[in-house]
């Protein structure tokens, strides 16, 4: 005979209403109660009818997740943290990617709303000026931003500007005076722009001149000529490169090696994200490390709190970052502060065509 919710209530010792809440809104039930009810459900092999539950409660147990890309492990690590807690709560995630395109962000939001998701967890190109987020606020669809650090919207992130400031200050403390920043498209990412502001502020606060940031495609197979031109000219050669993310730093380290530069003997490289794979490189990548999986977990908790009617005085949750030292950064002395290298670096292009 098929078990019913009454059977689960009788075996667990809780009311039918409590069992129903454990099934339909597990975040509203205490962990011990939830564990007891789930044990009874498994013992009885009770399987709720999902269609009937949706029709009765107008609930889908679906949460939409919008990420820029799966290519960057930052977002997949975050998704792992999200999925961990979503599964425990009995929810399913519908995940879409946007490739940092605002039109695709709009399409993703519209698609997920048509799927009747009960909330959104998302990263957008620019959270500070985003009419679609304003529309979600007006319509009452709950959401939490991840990696977008904006003080006026519900979000979970690190302080990107402060994190970059601390990373560049770490380079300065190691003796570097000419630090070049490489980034993807600054226009496509408010996070990259905040990191650039932190980079520039750190140098300015130490009485140093920020260099113009170079924007490159981290999917490109080779370092662009513009970067190589900086590195092969004694007048413009930096002693360290700060990359706006770890994937870019890995591309840079590969390009430097192919151009006969040694990291860190000829030039130091600092990334941003703290990806575990960076520690497997030779030399291990120094990086500003962010708690990516915990960002996902915290975003889920924030969304659950919003769905339960809880509010926070500060809608933005800022998680701590750390500067992870690594073999890709070395200390240099006063004689090296001019940015002319340590005597081992190349003085020319080494056969590379640095022109278009």
Summary of predicted features, one role per range:
Residues 1-60, 343-344, 353-356:
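N-terminal helix-turn-helix DNA-binding module of bacterial transcription factors
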Residues 35, 46-119, 185, 196-203:
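Amphipathic helical "hinge" segments at domain boundaries
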Residues 105-116, 223-236:
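Short, well-structured alpha-helical segments in soluble
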Residues 100, 122-166, 247, 273-285, ...:
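Flexible loop/hinge segments that line or gate small-molecule binding clefts
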Residues 15, 61, 118, 176-178, ...:
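Short acidic/polar active-site loop segments enriched in Thr and Asp
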Residues 211, 225-356:
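Flexible loop/turn connectors
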Residues 68-77, 95-104, 156-166, 182-227, ...:
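Hinge/beta->alpha junction and helix N-cap segments in small-molecule ligand-binding domains
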